């Protein structure tokens, strides 16, 4: 019956009667009480007379003496209708949620832990009883802040709805409890929305789950408000540390702030098939912390010694009475505002409290016991996420250790080497972690910044690190420690420049800490004024750095002092990170020592002669026994190449070995690259910062593959040329050095020519007019010149290489552009000749798996009708676009321009297929020559009015091909096909970064022999050969590996157009090698799988093969092509990889040096 009693509603001194209405959605008051008020919005209002739009006002009312702020609408009635939400005290039914909290136990714990006197504890107990409605009594209980609702959907672009993540089944019961409790309190409502945000459950330390929503999509389109939280470091530095300290946690503070109903939609999320919206500020929303903190700060203004950081409140006083009085004021304001307090997370009237993750005492701030427990529970990480979590935890306490940065550097160096589920954690990393934990557990308290005192900054530097300490003037305890590890550039600085670098970085932070006070800098520099007289020859840093350093001398806020108590730079001890690079050979079963050497050739050319030496030891019962040694000559290469080659050789020998293995090299570059840089190089595609291929790229790729096969091999660096008693590795290192030096002299020690028997017979038969061996034509002359077998043919003298070296020559010529048989033959015939060259080349081409995967069906095509071509260069250009390709460096198209007479090709990557891009490219190209005719298809890039005007100004005739008839532009269309094949084979097994390969593709296209003319496009265009490296005539080995490194990767055969793969002009047979078509291959990926044998023939059109997954599969021959270069269905060699017969017959011998 109490609900039927009228209520007293007061507005601006006018009192009227009001009645509680359980069905009212909004409070209604007479319009006379709203005179002079401006409406905040409009809303549809439903009454017995229908639905109509009305103005909504936000006003202050008193209902039964209680002041409230609420939204109302005006009516013609002379009394007020009040919604239940505005008078929650009318319904005396207590709040009931899922999990009840024990307030008596929490209050008792706070009373027992406080340092209050007996009287003070009684007063605190009375405060607990007085503000009983202020304490959180249920888990997920929410306050109700009566303020104007926030407008949060302030962006101009609607966010994109997001899909829901997979939910851990263990989290669903806890999340459901939270949603049910919030629905009871009106914090959530069930409502459909065009937006959706995924729910992301996060585990709590107690084993339960917290409901978190991923509002990144909403935050991306929401403007950031200007009011933001103060940085926690600034708050910690300005805390008043009285005897009595209290920290208060405002429970679910964001959920106490209402938002306007028209913004509910942007907060929506889906749970168990139903969509819910927040009626309050959601957690995770961009502007929630700023809006909430700003309200709490305004609410607590006037209370001394109070600091607020989001939902954490700190208050401290020296007097017990004063502290309790201000707690009473603080509790009253929070209760009247509608907040609730979590006593479980609060600490009242104590001498030591935890605030913002630190322990606050009268001495200063320190690390909490909870943080130290987390340190003790750290274990070696096995995933990248665990490593990052450990680094984040340690980095929180970085200001408590003077040399923190240099100690943690080895752990940060693991990040680029780690993968999602692998971290290369070693013993030295565990030692580093233990050192950090020990120092953090023993770290002293740091003092807070006192704004009435001058800031003292003390700096010093070692060879690798700069050290900084901040103090309040006259105090002994530091405010903070900072350490700076010098970069690679800064390590080259002089001692003075390293100190100035440390001063510069320290002052950047000191200006924030100074609080308007002066800064005094103490350093080992005797006179800062004298550094202006530093001569240019004594400077290693750039002039811009010196300018910024000297600018501090003019700043009136900063004064510099010499501190004679600081140790001189040269006397600082070396940094000990606990890392021992020495690996004793007795701890390993197999030990390899590698070295490389190079000497200058005594010949007129002055080439380098390189050699490598490798020694292999076995550990038997603690005694090292030399097992084998190698001394191998490498020809015209650098010493660095020899070091890498020797290292690669040792890794290959490690593959079949069992047990732990140690490889020792005297090259710091090789050891550091293998241990620290190789994984980063592999992830970047073996290019440097300028996107250029690394030196010796082919060797490093091989080493990376070997490391993946044997990641357990330990590699260490040992300086060379040491005395035998100075290191356990000295003997093996010196022996490897002797073998490498010996190998570098081998080229000139060998005097007898290494000829085959048939070559010797041919020379002798020619001299004695006897019968020549089979395959050697009698019309030619055969002689021995410079230890080489030479033949005089119609086109001049040619070398006949030994049979064991012919495979290398064919492989080298083919790998330049993976050309076909005729093109390879022409390339080799420039310098060499031997019997049955075509047969040997065909045998080799049949072994190239990459060509088999990309080349079309190799059947003889029908000859097309001859096309009349121009006879002079630059008369006519064909042009067309390739693309869109996968994005690379922002480019998605390639403009191909082909000279009609010579076939010379220009490739220009573009970001768009437009006339502007075309004109830009042709302006560059016409700087060489202006063509008479430009032939293209009828694409918009070539038919626009702008392009036609450009051509008219240069007197260029435009010629277009017939629509839907690409044969009209056959020359450029064929080039397009060749370019795509080149890029496809080049990118096999590599990321689709084709932009940096365009220049190499163009070089390969223009320097591949055309069978019809027997010349390359470059020769036809310019009349001379391109400066393209081919073979080392002295050692039959590559002489310019860096230039060939990328060309060697181009895997494409520039064949003539052939019939489509669906051509049925072949019949399968059992045992035949065939290749299956790839279903819908992506751009720049192979179109055919690797060769496999035909197992059974079901009918003339269907066969059974073993597919790439190892399963038997029936396939139509329309989806197959016969593998090229087969003879009666068998390979030329039994090697499963299809190795050439010459290679199979060749026996590889290793030079074993007698240990005596």
Swiss-Prot record:
Function description: The aspartyl protease activity mediates proteolytic cleavages of Gag and Pol polyproteins. The reverse transcriptase (RT) activity converts the viral RNA genome into dsDNA in the cytoplasm, shortly after virus entry into the cell (early reverse transcription) or after proviral DNA transcription (late reverse transcription). RT consists of a DNA polymerase activity that can copy either DNA or RNA templates, and a ribonuclease H (RNase H) activity that cleaves the RNA strand of RNA-DNA heteroduplexes in a partially processive 3' to 5' endonucleasic mode. Integrase catalyzes viral DNA integration into the host chromosome, by performing a series of DNA cutting and joining reactions. This enzyme activity takes place after virion entry into a cell and reverse transcription of the RNA genome in dsDNA. The first step in the integration process is 3' processing. This step requires a complex comprising at least the viral genome, matrix protein, and integrase. This complex is called the pre-integration complex (PIC). The integrase protein removes 2 nucleotides from the 3' end of the viral DNA right (U5) end, leaving the left (U3) intact.
Record's protein name: Pro-Pol polyprotein
Domain Integrase catalytic: 869-1025
Positions bound to Mg(2+) 3: 875, 937
Domain topic, free-text comment: The reverse transcriptase/ribonuclease H (RT) is structured in five subdomains: finger, palm, thumb, connection and RNase H. Within the palm subdomain, the 'primer grip' region is thought to be involved in the positioning of the primer terminus for accommodating the incoming nucleotide. The RNase H domain stabilizes the association of RT with primer-template. Integrase core domain contains the D-x(n)-D-x(35)-E motif, named for the phylogenetically conserved glutamic acid and aspartic acid residues and the invariant 35 amino acid spacing between the second and third acidic residues. Each acidic residue of the D,D(35)E motif is independently essential for the 3'-processing and strand transfer activities of purified integrase protein.
Biased composition (Polar residues): 1144-1156
Domain RNase H type-1 residue range list: 586-745
Pfam families: Integrase_H2C2, RNase_H, RT_RNaseH_2, rve, RVT_1, SH3_11, Spuma_A9PTase
